[in-house]
């Protein structure tokens, strides 16, 4: 029994040994496969890391190259073809020949002397500010004298429109030429260097006396306002028997200093004239005589039909003007006639006649054509009061 048991065990052991060897070999193969797979994984990971590192290095190198200066530096090897810079002289006069000093001549300074003398002569010969107005005044005086020699009345006139009776432009013997003082520093018209024609008291009396009898050559220009006791006398043109000029105030205020624009004391172009006392009956007569409305323009001469219509209107208004100026106590409030004057653009002629109906109109037409050259000066007519 023992022999069979031992034999059985021996056979079993022999059978089991190859299986054990096979199992060992299989386990060894599996371990080798596992280790090889791990090694290959590590190798692949290392390769990826190396590739990433190389890419990063290349990117950094390219970025550094872009930051570098694009031009080449010449400091390393300078070019030999460049010319050397010339040495400039510190003083240009050192290079000039000194012939004048060798011959005993001194350098000329005539330019500096001439310039200094010119400056001194300008300062010494320049006129002071006080002499400049005197020269201008002398020139103006010569101009005024030449103008008076031509026979025209020259003066400074008020800017406001006023009724005027204009005839001959010859200067009146009764006018007094008043010239302001030259030394006054004021710039007003009272102290200016212009001549002002002021009518005397004798001429005013003749004007008031001749108001009842109208002169032979009378042409009335309209004014802007009625005559008031505070009115001023403006410059007349012509002789006292032929021409009379009466001024109306620019403003209603009688105080010359209160007016900012029309006052002659505050402006450089106007002159305060003597006041006309219209408290007398003769003054009131003039007040009614020269009351006109300002409907004045330069109207081109129309056809013959318009002239005939104007002559008819003038002849119809002549009786009113004569009736108003016959006696010194006659005072008829004038009124501006309308209706037929609309065709003439509200412009008609008002003129008193002492001889005939057509004669004065012809004289007035000649006077207006001489004054305006191309246009007829037509003023508003004065008609009697209507009931």
UniProtKB/Swiss-Prot annotation:
Q: Locations of Polar residues compositional bias?
A: 241-268
Give the record's PTM text: Phosphorylated on tyrosines upon TCR or BCR activation; which leads to the recruitment of GRB2, PIK3R1 and GRAP2.
Q: Which positions bear Phosphotyrosine?
A: 195, 270, 296, 375
Q: Membrane topology per the record? A: Single-pass type III membrane protein
Q: Which residues cross the membrane?
A: 38-58
A single Gene Ontology CC annotation of this entry is: cytosol
Which InterPro entries does the record cross-reference, listed alphabetically?
A: LAX (IPR031393)
The set of disulfide-linked cysteines is: none
The subcellular location is: Cell membrane
- Per the record, ranges on the Extracellular side are 1-37
Write the record's keywords in alphabetical order, separated by commas.
Adaptive immunity, Cell membrane, Immunity, Membrane, Phosphoprotein, Signal-anchor, Transmembrane, Transmembrane helix
Q: Where is the composition biased (Acidic residues)?
A: 360-369
Sample GO molecular function, one term: SH2 domain binding
Major localisation: membrane
Point out the signal peptide segment: none
GO biological-process terms attached to the record: adaptive immune response; antigen receptor-mediated signaling pathway; B cell activation; immune response; intracellular signal transduction; lymphocyte activation; negative regulation of MAPK cascade; negative regulation of T cell activation
Query: Where in the sequence does UniProt note compositional bias of the Basic and acidic residues kind?
Result: 319-329
Query: What functional role does this protein have?
Result: Negatively regulates TCR (T-cell antigen receptor)-mediated signaling in T-cells and BCR (B-cell antigen receptor)-mediated signaling in B-cells.
Q: Quaternary structure?
A: When phosphorylated, interacts with GRB2, PIK3R1 and GRAP2.
Q: What is this protein called?
A: Lymphocyte transmembrane adapter 1
Native species of this protein?
Bos taurus
Give the source lineage, highest ranks first.
Answer: Eukaryota, Metazoa, Chordata, Craniata, Vertebrata
Provide the gene name from the record. Answer: LAX1
